[in-house]
Amino acid sequence: SMTRQCQEPNHLVLGYVSTEESCKSVRRFDMIRKTYYLLRRAQRSYGYRTNMPNVIFRKSDFMREQGYQGNLEYVRGEYDFLVNKYALCGDTAVELAPSAWLQQEAPTDKNWHNKSLYLQASRKSLKRNLSMRTLMFFDHLIPHLSLIASIAVLVCSIVMKDWILTGCAGFALLLLIVLRTIIAHRAVACFDSLIPTYKLPFYDYGIIWRNFANKVRYWRADKN
C-alpha cells in the first residue's frame, strides 16, 4: 500500500507503525497523539519529522542532497532528519491503510526515555521547529486553562455557597472532560482500540507533566 503513493508529485511517503500490546497504554497514547500532529503537518504543508520508522523517499533526492549530510553529529534521529530534509524536495503523502502498517516491539523504559533525550538534543537542528512547537503549546494551553478556570469557579462558588453557580461550574467541568474524552477516544480508536477509555482524560491532561519529566531528564543527562 505504501508503494501506491510512490508517484508524482510525491517525493516522500509516511506510514504508521503500531506498537506491541505489551507496551504501556500511556506510551501508546503518547505515540498516537504525536503521530496525529506529525501526519497532519505532512498532509497540510511540509513534513516536519516522524516518530515512526515507516518512510519511503526517492533515491534520486537522497543522492542529490548528499544523504545524511547535516545530521552526522547525532547518534539517533535519522528518521526525523530524513523527513525534515527531504520533505522540501516535493509533496509528502500519508498512507494510513492497515495493510501498510508496520509493528515495532514495546520499548524498554531505557529506550523510551532515551528516545525523548535524543529528540530534545537534535530538535534544534530541525527546520520548521518553531511553528510545530507553537502549535503544540497552544493545543496544550487552551484545554488546561479551561480546566483550571472551571475548577477555580467551582471552588469559589462552593466557598461563597452559591449553589446555582456551583451546579453550572460542575456541569461545565464535567462537560469539558467528557467532550475531550470522546474526542480522544475517536482519535485513538483509529489506531489502537485497546487503550481503556476511562484512562484517556488522565493521559490527556497528564501530557504536560510527562513532558516536564522528560525536560528534567534532559537537563540532568550527561551531554558529553
What are these regions (language model features)?
Residues 1, 108, 142-143:
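Residues at alpha-helix caps and immediate loop-helix transition turns in enzyme cores, especially N-
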Residues 2-69, 120, 200, 204-207, ...:
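Long helical/loop segments within the catalytic core of UDP-sugar-dependent glycosyltransferases
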Residues 6, 12-34, 69-135:
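Catalytic donor/gating beta->alpha subdomain of glycosyltransferases that bind UDP-sugars
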Residues 51-52, 222-224:
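Short alpha-helical "patches" and their helix-cap loops
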Residues 142-222:
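Membrane-embedded multi-pass helical conduit in multi-pass membrane proteins
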